[in-house]
Amino acid sequence: MHNKKFLLIGPTESVLTKRGNRFPDFANFLHKNGAQIEYYTTDFYHAEKRRFTIKEIFEAKTICPYKLIVWHVLGYSGNISIRRLISNFLFSSILFIRLISRVKKADSIIIPSRPVELIFFVSLIKLIKGSKIYLDIQDIWPDALQINHKFRKKVFTYYCNIFLRNSLKRYTYTFHTAPSFVNWLRRYSKNTPSVFLPLGWDTSRWEDKLTGVVPQTEMNQNEFNLVVVAQLQHQIDIMPVLDFLRTNSNYSLTIIGEDGNGERYGDVTAFIKHNEIRNVKFVGVVAREKMSDHLRDKDIGLLPMITTSIPNKIFDYLGAKLPIVVLGKNDSSDFVDKFDIGWSCNYNSESFESLMKSISWGNLVKKKANVEKVRMHFCRDNLHEEFFKIVTAKCNNLHKS
């Protein structure tokens, strides 16, 4: 294992970023197990649409136990824009040019499922050099991007298909973070093996940090403290929840992670102000290590997301030992229902209100017990072991989906 080299490519995710640490965790785990790591990322912070400072980059390289390579890239201001596509293409093509002469057949490359240009150019490295390549499916283009303009959506879909159609079949193995993502994979490749490897929760953030939790009592049942961990981007629609809170002041909602720049932030605050809702609290962006402090006195974690996936916030709730309510029918609702760790309802205020008023203290205790039973299956320590077995296996036919 000491001679094994892994190249991890994370254009928007690294030790520099505050959101998303799956790839840095992969890199740390492989490094601790004796692998040689090269981690490629960029100087552009996608979440905040800004460049990292020289100081931030220097400090990141200083604390990194492996080799961190930070490239300058073209910045952009919109998630859906020509400039972003150009930036993605330039990064991916330059990566190919620089790596093709350096990568050896014995090396392994691990990349995320976006941008699609990266999927294509890394598949060319496999075609030419024979290296093993692994894809971590956390997001799916073009499906995941919400484009209302029909012509633009058609053009973007065509653009994505150009890069995906003949690329995914070359991948040695893939990991999908939500079951429905396999449908996307099979659209382009019938035989590429894949295994369910969810995002999971970090034991260092949660274990031994939940002491002093304020317990609910029979005295205040049906007066639950609700929480949403999310920035109010397009895919997060909390309006059904706010409509419920408008007429149910005995419930409270805390929103963690909104910095005032979310796409829905203006509409949400306007609705709260217009209806004089006083039982909603904004906390703002919270450091990962401080999240447990903000969830320790909450009763139920909410996921009001219009797109399908099983995001990090689900595992924040699991880490905090909270039952979960999912609005809508999607991968997250299937996950919660399968393990009986919460509830799901239709995506409207009437269904949400009916559900909330049906939840008693006894129901909550039962769901909490189920959370306790299953949560360790989804801690990252265990998931990393599964990941390690696959990327170090001599024959990658362990778990076909």
PLM features: what roles do these ranges have?
Residues 7, 175, 217-236, 242-246, ...:
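Conserved donor-binding/catalytic core segment of Leloir-type glycosyltransferases
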Residues 349-354, 361-393:
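A charged, aromatic-enriched C-terminal amphipathic alpha-helix characteristic of glycosyltransferases
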Residues 264-265, 277-287, 294:
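Active-site donor-binding acidic/aromatic loop of nucleotide-activated sugar
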Residues 180, 200:
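Carbohydrate-associated surface elements
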